[in-house]
A protein has these predicted regions:
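Long, low-complexity, polar/charged, intrinsically disordered or flexibly structured peripheral segments
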Residues: 192-366
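Primarily recognizes the serine-hydrolase "nucleophile elbow" in alpha/beta-hydrolase
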Residues: 52-130, 355
Length: 447
């Protein structure tokens, strides 16, 4: 953090870190007190403090830039979407927040794990071409919290065939298909161009184009970039050969005669060979509550709770659909019933409300007074090409929602895939970030 702060200061920026309650915050009795949406409440209070004291603090609090990746990217996107939302007024009044606005100026959303109300479905649409996955060490528990690390292999390189159901029960393939279909319907319901099979229409081809453009930019700028890849692949041609040799690019890549203009010709083949799936199904609200996202939904004693309304409802459908079916053994069907009951017990009306207000796309897609907010005028989403998490479909939904439903409220939204970058603040050259911020600030000062 210190190195990053120094770099920002050298660029002429003022970096502010706001203390906020979060998923690990406990009181003197070790009770958890950082439940959602309190991280948003505290950050908004910090923004209001900066604005209320703008005359005596360095910088300009009307030009706030949110910066974060993964869950931090999600929080930043939420700040940009929910500015001045009345939903938070009561919370802010309770903690004595300053009487000021809390909208921000620029959102830098790196691989934001957000829009959790549709995330489990979006991940199946995004990763449908990946027929195997690995699990992080934290996932080696069953649905009851028992350690099963002696029964399953975890960690990168230990892949399970999709549908292997390593946590027990014949559920994965069936639920994944339902989630995929639900997401196609969901995207279509907002008027976006997505074919019924989820693999044609501008919403799909536009996402694929992000990868094509990302690789093209990488190859075009390869000579000027500082990257460890150059130790093995001294020029763009050598790097391309690496894609053919190590990632089967003959099945998914077409390169123009110039040697740098790339086209991803088969998205699912590309996903299956280049991007690892690092989540089972369901991906974010996992059966064992052990996913990273599950850590945000805890009670005062730290017990995790299921949060996905969608998974709850689809499991309920499966219980009814297969009640008199011979598709599963009695033991397998009983497992599905127990899963459905576990989600139903956790996901109540309050959980539903929290999930909705913490999904930033809702502030853009809905036009009723409840969701009214002041959107950030500038949005920049970056996701690494090697990122197998939920960041790209989440950012893609936000980007399309902003351009379609809020074009008259914002000034710009850009989204890019940064090639050869993992789940991270993905930039192929950090100077690109500085140039983006400086350009917008210069335009603002000239107005």
């Amino acid at each position: 953090m210190q190195d990053v702060t120094i770099a920002y200061m050298q660029e002429g920026y003022v970096q502010v870190s706001v203390g906020a309650r979060g998923k690990d915050t406990v009181d003197a009795e070790d009770h958890y007190i950082g439940q959602l949406p309190l991280i948003m409440v505290d950050l908004k209070a910090g923004i209001r403090y900066l604005k209320a004291n703008n005359d005596v603090l360095p910088g300009d609090a009307e030009r706030i830039v949110s910066y974060g990746y993964s869950s931090g990217g999600a929080v930043g996107v939420m700040l940009g979407a929910s500015g001045n939302s009345a939903i938070y007024d009561g919370y802010l009044a309770d903690i004595g927040a300053a009487d000021a606005t809390d909208d921000i100026f620029i959102v830098l959303g790196y691989c934001p794990i957000t829009n959790l109300d549709s995330a489990d479905a979006a991940y199946e649409w995004f990763q449908a071409g990946n027929q195997e996955y690995f699990l992080f060490n934290a996932m080696a528990v069953d649905m009851y919290g028992n350690d099963i690390s002696d029964q399953i292999t975890v960690g990168r390189g230990n892949f399970h065939p999709f549908g292997d159901n390593v946590l027990g029960g014949a559920h994965e393939d069936e639920l994944a298909a339902k989630l995929y279909d639900w997401y196609v319907d969901y995207v279509q319901s907002w008027g976006f161009d997505l074919g019924d099979d989820g693999r044609d229409g501008a919403y799909f081809t536009g996402l694929v184009q992000l990868y094509s453009d990302g690789l093209t930019q990488w190859l075009t700028r390869y000579d000027e970039l500082s990257t460890p890849d150059k130790e093995k692949y001294p020029d763009a041609a050598a790097y391309v050969q690496h894609l053919y040799d190590d990632y089967g690019a003959d099945a998914w890549l077409e390169l123009a005669e110039d040697g740098v203009t790339a086209t991803i010709t088969d998205y699912d083949a590309f996903m299956g060979s280049f991007i690892s799936r690092n989540k089972m199904c369901p991906s974010l609200d996992s059966y064992n509550k052990a996913s990273n996202e599950g850590s945000a939904f805890v009670d005062a004693d730290g017990n995790r709770k299921h949060f996905s309304v969608l998974v709850r409802d689809l499991l309920g459908e499966m219980v009814e659909e297969y009640r008199d079916s011979d598709a599963f053994t009695a033991e397998e069907y009983d497992y599905i019933v127990r899963l459905a009951d576990a989600y139903a017990a956790d996901v109540d009306d309050e959980a539903t409300r929290l999930l909705e207000i913490m999904s930033p796309a809702n502030y853009v897609l809905h036009d009723d007074a409840y969701w009214a907010s002041t959107l950030a005028p500038h949005w920049r989403f970056h996701i690494g090409s090697a990122d197998g998490d939920h960041g790209l479909p989440a950012a893609w939904l936000m980007h399309n929602a902003l351009l379609t439903y809020a074009a008259d409220e914002i000034e710009d939204s850009v989204i890019e895939v940064s090639w050869d970058q993992p789940h991270s603040p993905a930039e192929i050259d950090v100077q690109d970030l500085y140039d983006y911020i400086d350009g917008i600030m210069a335009d603002a000062l000239s107005e």
